């Protein structure tokens, strides 16, 4: 039976008290030595139950993620067979207070390992590392759940590297030619395998670590294995191939780690994993790390792990995102989302690294191509060769371009530090995908932002996602022109601060002359040009996001109104005030505020200016807005990911909104139209289709909505290589072509 380690609090002090009312033989499931404070990080709550008629006792250990080990505790990690304590009581509770983090320098690690960690700036353990350390050093099999981006690689890496280093003694064993691996790590993707390899190599450069995965030549991997290796990290498929080719022998493996075990199932590696485990030595230590625990993972643990200790840093809570990730959600349409995407990157990334996740490879190419006209962007997906993918990732890490558009191949295992922003271009297939996509930012305690793009008809689905993940979105409007100008100016100023003083000298005379002629206007013009705003930016609707349109807000005095407010009554009001506005009005949505009666609607910018010059009847107010108020929700009701019915694919009515170019539908009602519908039935019938496009046709936003679980993409055409590329190649620096088409690929 497995013990369980949960997470009730944040910190523990190196203190342990256990009451011992009786002295009985302890269980084989968990043995603790009480004369030495080796288990001080754990706050233990002992509960026992009898299995059938036997006397086997099953304890439950509860530990905090930030459990603390003192130096004395670390030195006393060995178990003692002399002290016994009672597990038969109903509850033996251990109280603990807050304490400080555990410093690497107090762990008595091998000097070479400690120095390597310090060079990397790793001075304290993260929660998952603290929770795993003691049982891992005891040799326990472990099942661990933790939030993404919390340092799981070093959680198993530090204790295993420590034991390998101590077993090798004077390191001569590390130099023995032809030695077989003692440490095996299985990962579901090439990217995760390479990340684990990098962590181990940087932490223990004196160990020979080899990473094996598909998509590259066998020769180099086989040669490395032949020379002798201490650690093998790889994907199950390639490891099976190497075993069958007799290049990889696992007869001396002492430590096994399955990283992201739940994803092994997702990518179809379950049979390969079980085949590998069947061929490993029975006497070994195994650790399984998984964000979720599907049936296959539980079965795997029962069959191949020996009395595993469950370390759960997520528990029953829904929230699985790392701390420090700010979540936003924004409603878009299929025709406007690419323009909005560029604006979101400008405002929220603030010049930092951004990863945009798409559902399909075609979308990744299209979005990357569209963004590249204004932002340095590259795509990453399964059709790109492994060599090209590695070069693209390295260039992204080095800042040669700032936006990476990727499919879910990049949502797990990518080692990309300092990602400031993650954007979900469509709703993900399920909550777990959302968590792991978002986990590319806010890693290792840093802050980051994630933005979810959705259509108006998917609003309730977003609410379902909030409940399933246990998170909260801040619903935002598209960035305004003012937001773009301010953010762009800030980024240009930051760029100017990086100009070398010697370069400034060459332009000082010209700058002085311009200043004398134009004053600060000269600098303002330079900032505008560098920001990409040589021409004034055009207005944009907050509802449809169409350029050249603006959004107005109409508020009426309920004391002077009759009946209910509806889209039809708004059109009637506009008809009386300015008939042209009624003919050209776009989307209309009612405001979701019981304290007022109001609506927002779209108009072409010039017509809106003319409308605002009209005299508005007393008791009503009409204004142009830059941020949307809460609107009545007319989205589909469903909590089932990927299982929406056909009716959910169209926005629902209810009078909440109407199509643009409302024609004269309501104009003939005259001023009484503003009085509203006389009854609820009339209001329902007037709603029709909730959101129409101008000209009376149905909105593309309704037919092309991305739904969770849906695999269809927008109806735009696939990108053509004949199409002009507006960015610059990050290899040669020249414009007009991508890195994949660069004629200068020497060393690429």
From Swiss-Prot:
EC numbers: 3.6.4.13
Organism: Arabidopsis thaliana
Domain Helicase C-terminal: 340-485
Entry's free-text remark on domains: The Q motif is unique to and characteristic of the DEAD box family of RNA helicases and controls ATP binding and hydrolysis.
Biased composition (Basic and acidic residues): 669-682, 738-748
Chief place where the protein resides: plastid
GO biological process: chloroplast organization; Group II intron splicing; response to salt stress; ribosome biogenesis
Protein name in the entry: DEAD-box ATP-dependent RNA helicase 3, chloroplastic
Gene3D superfamilies linked: P-loop containing nucleotide triphosphate hydrolases, Zinc finger, CCHC-type
Cellular localisation: Plastid, Chloroplast; Plastid, Chloroplast stroma
Entry's Gene Ontology molecular function annotations: ATP binding; ATP hydrolysis activity; mRNA binding; RNA helicase activity; zinc ion binding
Family recorded in the similarity comment: Belongs to the DEAD box helicase family. DDX21/DDX50 subfamily.
Keywords from the UniProt entry: ATP-binding, Chloroplast, Helicase, Hydrolase, Metal-binding, Nucleotide-binding, Phosphoprotein, Plastid, Ribosome biogenesis, RNA-binding, Transit peptide, Zinc, Zinc-finger
Gene that this sequence comes from: RH3
């Amino acid at each position: 039976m497995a013990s369980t380690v949960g997470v009730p609090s944040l910190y523990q002090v190196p203190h342990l008290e256990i009451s011992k009312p009786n002295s009985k033989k302890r269980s084989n499931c968990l043995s603790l030595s009480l004369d030495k404070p080796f288990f001080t990080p754990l706050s233990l709550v002992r509960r026992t139950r009898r299995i059938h008629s036997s006397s086997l006792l099953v304890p439950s250990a509860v530990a905090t993620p930030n459990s603390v080990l003192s130096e004395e505790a670390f030195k006393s990690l060995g178990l003692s067979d002399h002290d016994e304590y009672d597990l038969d009581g109903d509850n033996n509770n251990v109280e603990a207070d807050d304490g400080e983090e555990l410093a690497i320098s107090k762990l008595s690690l091998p000097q070479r390992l400690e120095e390597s960690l310090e060079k990397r700036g790793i001075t304290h353990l993260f929660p998952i590392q603290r929770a795993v350390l003691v049982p891992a050093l005891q040799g326990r099999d472990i099942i661990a759940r933790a939030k993404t981006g919390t340092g799981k690689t070093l959680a198993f890496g530090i204790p295993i590297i420590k034991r390998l280093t101590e077993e090798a003694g004077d390191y001569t064993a590390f130099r023995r030619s032809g030695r077989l691996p003692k440490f095996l790590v299985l990962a579901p993707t090439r990217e995760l395998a390479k990340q684990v390899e990098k962590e181990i190599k940087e932490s223990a450069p004196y160990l020979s670590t080899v990473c094996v995965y598909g998509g590259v030549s066998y020769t180099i991997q086989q040669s490395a294995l032949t020379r002798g290796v201490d650690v093998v990290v790889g994907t199950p498929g390639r490891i099976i191939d190497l075993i069958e080719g007799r290049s990889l022998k696992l007869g001396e493996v002492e430590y096994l780690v399955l990283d992201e075990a739940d994803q092994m199932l997702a990518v179809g590696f379950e049979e390969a994993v079980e085949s590998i485990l069947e061929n490993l030595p029975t006497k070994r230590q195994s650790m399984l790390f998984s964000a979720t625990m599907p049936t296959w993972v539980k079965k795997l643990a029962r069959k191949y792990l020996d009395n595993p200790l469950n370390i759960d840093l997520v528990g029953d809570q829904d929230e699985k995102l790392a701390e420090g990730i700010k979540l936003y959600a924004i409603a878009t349409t299929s025709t406007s989302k690419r323009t909005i995407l560029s604006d979101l990157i400008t405002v929220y990334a603030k010049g930092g690294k951004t990863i945009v996740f798409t559902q399909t490879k075609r979308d990744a190419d299209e979005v990357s191509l569209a963004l590249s006209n204004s932002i340095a962007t590259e795509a990453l997906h399964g059709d790109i060769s492994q060599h090209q993918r590695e070069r693209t990732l390295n260039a992204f890490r080095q800042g040669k371009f700032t936006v990476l558009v990727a499919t879910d191949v990049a949502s797990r295992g990518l080692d990309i530090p300092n990602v400031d922003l993650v954007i979900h271009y469509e709703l993900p297939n399920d909550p777990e995908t959302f968590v792991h996509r978002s986990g590319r930012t806010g890693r290792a305690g840093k802050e980051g932002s994630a933005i979810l793009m959705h259509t108006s008809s998917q609003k309730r689905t977003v609410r379902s996602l909030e409940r399933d993940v246990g998170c909260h979105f801040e619903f935002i409007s598209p960035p305004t022109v003012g937001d773009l100008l301010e953010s762009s100016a800030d980024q240009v100023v930051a760029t100017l601060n990086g100009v070398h003083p010697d370069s400034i000298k060459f332009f000082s005379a010209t700058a002085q002359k311009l200043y004398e002629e134009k004053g600060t206007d000269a600098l303002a013009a330079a900032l505008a040009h560098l920001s990409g705003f040589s021409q004034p930016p055009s207005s944009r609707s907050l509802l449809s996001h169409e350029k050249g349109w603006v959004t107005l807000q109409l508020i009426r005095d309920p004391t002077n109104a009759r009946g209910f407010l509806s889209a039809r009554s708004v059109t009637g009001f506009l008809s009386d005030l300015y008939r042209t506005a009624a003919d050209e009005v776009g989307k209309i949505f009612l405001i979701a505020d019981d304290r007022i009666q109001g609506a927002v609607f779209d108009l072409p910018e010039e017509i809106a200016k003319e409308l605002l010059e009209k005299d508005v009847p007393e008791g009503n107010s009409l204004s142009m807005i830059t941020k949307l108020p809460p609107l009545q929700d007319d989205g589909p009701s469903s909590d089932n990911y990927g299982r929406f019915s056909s009716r959910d694919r169209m926005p629902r009515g209810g009078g909440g909104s109407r199509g643009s170019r409302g024609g004269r539908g309501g104009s003939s009602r005259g001023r009484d139209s503003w009085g509203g519908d006389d009854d609820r039935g009339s209001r329902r019938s007037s709603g029709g289709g909730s959101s129409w496009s101008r000209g009376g046709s149905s909105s593309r936003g309704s037919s092309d909505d991305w739904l969770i679980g849906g695999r269809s993409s927008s109806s735009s055409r696939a990108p053509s290589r004949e199409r002009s590329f507006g960015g610059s190649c990050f290899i040669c620096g020249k414009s007009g072509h991508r890195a994949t088409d660069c004629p200068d690929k020497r060393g690429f």
